[in-house]
């Protein structure tokens, strides 16, 4: 699964998942914690992260939503996603 970004100990990844049941989303990992966020709108759809890390991921995703959606489309068409800048 390609790593799109990494910041503050959080790793952002995205799977290539095809089919109408798979809404655009990404996975955020921190240690043993994992959360899945939808892209439109940016919202937690599964799992959990500690509150501070969840806020960081949500802020980052809001800033990078168009890039995340573009990477989702790249993956679904069989193309490698592009890296996305982390939070400063």
Protein language model regions, located:
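Basic nucleic-acid-binding interfaces
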Residues: 1-88
């Amino acid at each position: 699964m390609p790593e799109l970004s990494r910041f503050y100990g959080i790793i952002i990844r995205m799977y290539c998942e095809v089919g109408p049941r798979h809404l655009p989303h990404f996975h955020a990992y921190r240690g043993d914690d994992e959360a899945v966020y939808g892209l439109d709108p940016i919202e937690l759809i599964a799992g959990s992260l500690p509150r501070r890390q969840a806020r960081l991921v949500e802020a980052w995703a809001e800033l990078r939503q168009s890039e995340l959606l573009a990477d989702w489309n790249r993956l679904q068409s069989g193309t490698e996603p592009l890296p996305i800048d982390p939070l400063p």
